[in-house]
Amino acid sequence: MKAKAKSTEASIASATGKLLRSYFGKGPGALYVSLAHSYLIIYLKDFITPMESVLLKQKQALKIEETRDIVMEKCMPELKAMWHNEFGIQAQHIYYDWNLANKTGVIFADLKGAQLTKHFSALSSEQEAKIHQEIKRFTEKAQKAPRNIASVRLNERTIISKREDILVSIEKELISSGFEEQLRLSKRKLEKNIINRSYLESILKQGIEDLFVDWDFQQDIGYVVFILQAEK
């Protein structure tokens, strides 16, 4: 089963990389796929185009994010169809985020049904409680405390936390008034700046290499994805 899962993940990485290359003009240097606990997560490395490199040197990161959001809006339906047609994976919603300074990114999806291909050791109850405490703290500081938080560890280096019911009234009004893109860009920066990485690293006893956030504003759901450093 492990060999089959690895083969599927490698095939997903190859097909996804080709599709991203067709939309962005350059694919990621490497893709790492995790398929577990009803989630598909793809970690991208060395993912930046020559034009984006120029804009980044000119401190135009926001312009890059805006452009990528437009491209991803067109790309996501094709990604969803490809995963379903080639691998039988039914994604409910696709999420994504970037770390332009590191030239990294993540694309992930929550899957329909119990599509559980494998499991990894769960977080300890103490770790989970403390992680949720920090997620509640920074989410409350940015908007309001979540009604519910659920976290799973997909593998040695990937943790995903789901937050429900986090939007405040002004955010809901901005979304209904057509300012969803502006809200997304602002919240990305805000949440990453206020999360206490060193505290979480002390709980996990593992460094955090990358941290990503995204939302389904219509369902009032937010996610945090932690990519951990490889254990030495």
Language model segments and positions:
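A cross-kingdom feature marking solvent-exposed beta-strand/loop segments within repeated
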Residues: 1-4, 27-28, 63, 81, ...
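N-terminal ordered "arm"
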Residues: 1-49, 53
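An N-terminal amphipathic alpha-helical segment
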Residues: 34-51, 137-175
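Hydrophobic, ordered structural segments
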Residues: 70-114
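Short, hydrophobic/π-rich interface segment
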Residues: 72, 76-79, 165-207
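Extended, charged low-complexity segments
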Residues: 199-232
